[in-house]
Amino acid sequence: MSFNSSHLLPPQEDLPLRHFTDQSQQPPPQRHFSETPSLVTASFLNLPTTLTTADSDLAPPHRNGDNSVADTNPRWLSFHSEMQNTGEVRSEVIDGVNADGETILGVVGGEDWRSASYKAAILRHPMYEQLLAAHVACLRVATPVDQIPRIDAQLSQLHTVAAKYSTLGVVVDNKELDHFMSHYVVLLCSFKEQLQHHVCVHAMEAITACWEIEQSLQSLTGVSPSESNGKTMSDDEDDNQVESEVNMFDGSLDGSDCLMGFGPLVPTERERSLMERVKKELKHELKQGFKEKIVDIREEIMRKRRAGKLPGDTTSVLKEWWRTHSKWPYPTEEDKAKLVQETGLQLKQINNWFINQRKRNWNSNSSTSSTLTKNKRKRTGKS
């Protein structure tokens, strides 16, 4: 048994839905359900959960008879497939779990059964937690900040996915499965690094270029993008032409959102959240890259501070000499040699201390000397 490309999906993906659009192709003649099937939660870790037309057509009615589809359960998981073998349908029964935590029984056969057995084997594998963590890490890199709680909310439904495949007991080749799991984890880790590089480098370059264009436009026209309507043509005929060209591609697009319509460059909520995320990622990368250098510089500064700070008992001797010689605080070489013997410091340290001490007391000495000269002048004037 080999894990081909069709089975490389994560185990949290639900089984594919089958929609019979052709009237000539009829659905399987029998539906073996022990009870009326109910709606199931959205695909696990499948963030875009917009309800499509095909999903609404396949959604079963509620138990109260209402045919409306619940907004919170956009997809109905159908464990029903057909496998014809000599005119008979070969089926197996597995358990499923609906949104209310109740168990439902469905019929699975053929390729659906094989795919479900692969997913069950992956769920029971020891590396499944590591695989799921790598998959979620890739999602968190490229997901906007305001959408991250949706990932956590879907992770809380992990027990329902495990319960859904718990009844399958198909044995898979362990060596082949180990090889698949290990290579898939390595692939996801590499993909995460590529996503981080894209978010930190390419996306930031695009945002910066967009900001520069915005500033250039404002400097040339004097109008900020938020004040304008994003239109570059003033004639109604030209405006209608732009709208018709946009509608040719997609009826849901308008001139403000289309690049060919030169819409406003005002960032959306997701773009702002992406910018914040890019800034945080860049700040984190810078901290990690320069962390060792910052620590070395800090240690060097602290070492110099510790080296420049003299012990308290030695400074007391120097301060005492300063007070006794405050009128002329310039020690001679003999005084310095005596201070070296008394304090145990080096001659360079004593010289630096006196230089700094004179700088600290420079203002006080100048003020006292000026007052002394004024007093002398007054005395000489009176005499």
From Swiss-Prot:
GO terms for biological process: cellular response to ethylene stimulus; detection of ethylene stimulus. Residues 362-373 have a biased composition (Low complexity). The keyword DNA-binding applies. CDD domains: homeodomain. Residues 1-35, 52-73, 361-383 are annotated as: Disordered. GO terms for cellular component: nucleus. May form heterodimeric complex with the TALE/BELL protein BEL1, BLH1 and BLH2. Interacts with OFP1, OFP2, OFP3 and OFP4. This is Homeobox protein knotted-1-like 5. It comes from Arabidopsis thaliana (Mouse-ear cress). The gene is KNAT5.
